[in-house]
Amino acid sequence: MLRYCLISIFLAFLHSNLFGQIVINEFSASNFDSHQDNYGEYEDWIELYNTSNSDVDLNGWYLTDKPNNPTKWQFPSSFIVSANSVAIIYCSGLDEINGGVAHSNFKITQTKFNEVFVLSDASGSVVDSISVVPAQKSHSRGRDVNGGSTWSLFTTATPNANNTGAMLEYAPMPSFSQTSGYYSGPFDLTLSSTDPNALIYYTTDGSRPDNSANLYTGPFNISSTSVIKAVAYS
């Protein structure tokens, strides 16, 4: 459900890909219920993709969420990203590689608005980086396809899989012609969006709307106590 507008600004100096062999491919900073780690926990995660035809061992490489601390977490042992394949690092704070599953020594909080994933090789040279832009519950952000150049939004995250189902961004939040409150008589409610191409769906019973809810086609009458919720798709 796309209910609010997120301002997404990717600064050029925070999104670099100097060598192109290993890239940050996808991440979720809101993994509440979509992907479990090897301990059965829903930890946030970052996915790397090896664009080359050879396996790459990240032993001694660095990953951080703070650009001013690029060596915050060093891969403590061998961690292979196979040729043309993806690998997940869980941002759990556990600081381990156990059975080929990697856990960084830090957690991420997307509401801080100042976190940036930075991947560096063993010499400390930055290989890739990307700002942690907020997303809704269990959504992710990633390249439109594995290793692609365009960053997109995924309402169904694709950890350890091909990036598919990319969306450009959330649609703007719908507007209501009336505010919440008590009214002495019936009235017509108008829903609108700043996006002329948006389709608005709504419910009148307080349930969470999606694109199977009522499609808004024009003002509708409210004559009894109702809880109206709306979502825009574009």
Language model segments and positions:
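Bacterial Sec-dependent N-terminal signal peptides
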Residues: 1-22
